[in-house]
Amino acid sequence: MASLIQVRDLLALRGRMEATQISHTLRAPQPMIDAMLNQLEIMGKAVRIPEEADGCLSGSCKRCPEGKACLREWWVLR
């Protein structure tokens, strides 16, 4: 079972990661990692960095039925 400290240490080693990458690396369930990242954000230890929509070459993200599901969300330590 992953701990909050392991999530923090992994971010410190890798620089920035997506929640899914953290989940796979630590072999922990995605909802648990999401909760830990939110807790680190509340504590002021981690920052969520959403990817900008200007990377969409076709400009169809606004009309995408998945509602910008293709945009990545990165996490970094503060």
Swiss-Prot record:
Keywords of this entry: DNA-binding, Iron, Iron-sulfur, Metal-binding, Repressor, Transcription, Transcription regulation
Record flagged with keyword Protein biosynthesis: no
Annotated residues for binding of iron-sulfur cluster: 56, 61, 64, 70
GO molecular function ontology, one term from the record: iron ion binding
Membrane-spanning parts: none
Highest taxon, organism lineage: Bacteria
Function of the protein: May function as a transcriptional regulator that controls feoABC expression.
NCBIfam families: PRK15431.1
Family: Belongs to the FeoC family.
Official protein name in the record: Probable [Fe-S]-dependent transcriptional repressor
Species, as recorded: Salmonella arizonae (strain ATCC BAA-731 / CDC346-86 / RSK2980)
Gene name for this UniProt entry: feoC
